[in-house]
């Protein structure tokens, strides 16, 4: 949808949700520039499994890759990240 389409939908919103989110960081960044509403990102099960399979195949370092995938959403403008990896990410952040 174009920016004009979604802007009329946010009038009474408490937050904006982007899901799936990993492939839509450009949308998150545009939303961040356009609104003061909190932006929530939901890494859906398919995105989580894509990361887990990359780790299992040796294509992605678990700690660095999982952490970067989630921190990149924050850099794009997300205020809240909903993820199946929440416990693991919390552990990684605590160890940093």
Regions found by a protein language model. Name each.
Residues 1-11:
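Single conserved hydrophobic/aromatic residue that forms the stacking wall/gate
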Residues 1-2, 30, 71:
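Short, flexible, glycine/charge-rich loop motifs used to bind or transfer phosphoryl groups or to couple energy/partner
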Residues 13, 23-26, 45-52:
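Active-site pocket-lining segment
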Residues 13-22, 81-85:
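Catalytic beta/alpha-barrel core
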Residues 20-41, 87-96:
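Active-site-adjacent beta->alpha loops and helix N-cap segments on the catalytic face
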Residues 33-76, 95:
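Active-site-adjacent loop and "lid" segments of alpha/beta metabolic enzymes
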């Amino acid at each position: 949808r174009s920016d004009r389409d979604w802007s009329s939908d946010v009038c009474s919103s408490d937050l904006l949700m982007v899901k799936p989110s990993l492939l839509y960081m450009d949308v998150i960044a545009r939303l961040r520039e356009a609104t003061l509403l909190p932006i929530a990102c939901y890494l859906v099960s398919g995105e989580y499994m894509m990361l887990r399979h990359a780790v299992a195949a040796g294509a992605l370092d678990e700690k660095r890759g999982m952490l970067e995938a989630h921190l990149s959403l924050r850099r794009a403008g997300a205020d809240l990240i909903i993820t199946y990896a929440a416990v693991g990410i919390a552990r990684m952040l605590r160890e940093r």
